[in-house]
């Protein structure tokens, strides 16, 4: 066990112990050690693994999607001091989508560590599941991410409580809102994607055609998952999953 793991308070379950209990496929030893160090930071409330590593669909090219739920930000210097022990390539503090450290482990496997404020994330999921807020595509992705993640560390049980809160049947009002909003974007109103695609095609604007077609498909799959009362898994393997 790493030194960080030894610092766990008495009676507290470590990452290496908890991963077997939670059903997570066996992780590389260095990943386990890395996550034990992150979980030892006082700012860390919970750690979970998501994506194909959590659902059992990982292949040789699959990276690690790690979600660190914090009460306040862990200092970049502290994160770097942990990650440099296990990663040959590090990009600390990327903010292209969420707050992330994007790295490559010493064994060549990529690992994305996403940091989320626990309360903010819970509010975002509640806005969809309980307040029925539909988006232009990908509406239920965060909900899906929560209910399918595997918890590795949960200091006060807050993440498990959140999973239980949102482990509910697909709300019919939300389903209707997703279909209504995204169906209009496919066709039938002035800004609909089909009209924009035709206009771009008439101009032979290949970049615009590609962009509008991508948005069309985002709304199209959002409708399909809603119709089937399935949470949206993201942008990968959509044809086989819907």
Labelled PLM ranges:
Residues 51-85, 100-116:
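Catalytic metal-binding acidic patch
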Residues 211, 218-231:
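Short, charge-rich amphipathic alpha-helical segments embedded
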Residues 14-23, 87-201:
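Conserved NTP/Mg2+-binding pocket subregion across the NTase superfamily
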Residues 26, 185, 208-211, 215:
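Alpha-helical initiation/capping and key positions within long helical/coiled-coil segments
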Residues 2-48:
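Helical scaffold of the NTase/Pol beta-like nucleotidyltransferase catalytic core
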Residues 189-193, 197, 209, 216, ...:
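Amphipathic alpha-helices that form helix-helix packing interfaces
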Residues 201-208:
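Short helix-adjacent coil turns
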Residues 229-242:
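Short, charged amphipathic alpha-helical segments flanked by flexible coils
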């Amino acid at each position: 066990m790493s030194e960080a793991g030894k610092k766990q308070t008495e009676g507290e379950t470590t990452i290496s112990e908890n991963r077997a209990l939670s059903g997570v496929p066996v992780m590389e030893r260095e990943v386990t050690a890395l996550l034990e160090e992150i979980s030892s930071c006082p700012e860390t409330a919970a750690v979970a693994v998501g994506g194909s590593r959590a659902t059992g669909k990982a292949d040789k090219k699959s990276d690690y999607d790690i979600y660190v739920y914090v009460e306040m930000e862990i200092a970049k210097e502290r994160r770097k001091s942990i990650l440099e022990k296990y990663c040959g390539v590090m990009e600390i503090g990327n903010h292209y989508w969420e707050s992330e450290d994007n790295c490559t482990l010493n064994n060549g496997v990529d690992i994305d560590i996403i940091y989320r404020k626990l309360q903010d994330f819970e509010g975002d999921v509640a806005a969809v599941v309980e307040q029925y807020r539909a988006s232009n595509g990908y509406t239920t992705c965060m909900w899906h991410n929560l209910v399918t993640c595997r918890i590795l560390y949960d200091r006060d049980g807050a993440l498990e409580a959140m999973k239980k809160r949102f482990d509910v049947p697909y709300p019919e009002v939300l389903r209707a809102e997703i279909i209504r909003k995204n169906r209009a974007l496919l066709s039938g109103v002035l800004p609909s994607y089909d009209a924009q695609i035709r206009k771009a095609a008439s101009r032979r604007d290949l970049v615009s055609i590609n962009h509008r077609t991508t948005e069309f498909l985002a709304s199209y799959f959002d409708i399909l998952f809603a119709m089937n009362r399935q949470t949206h898994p993201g942008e990968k393997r959509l044809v086989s999953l819907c």
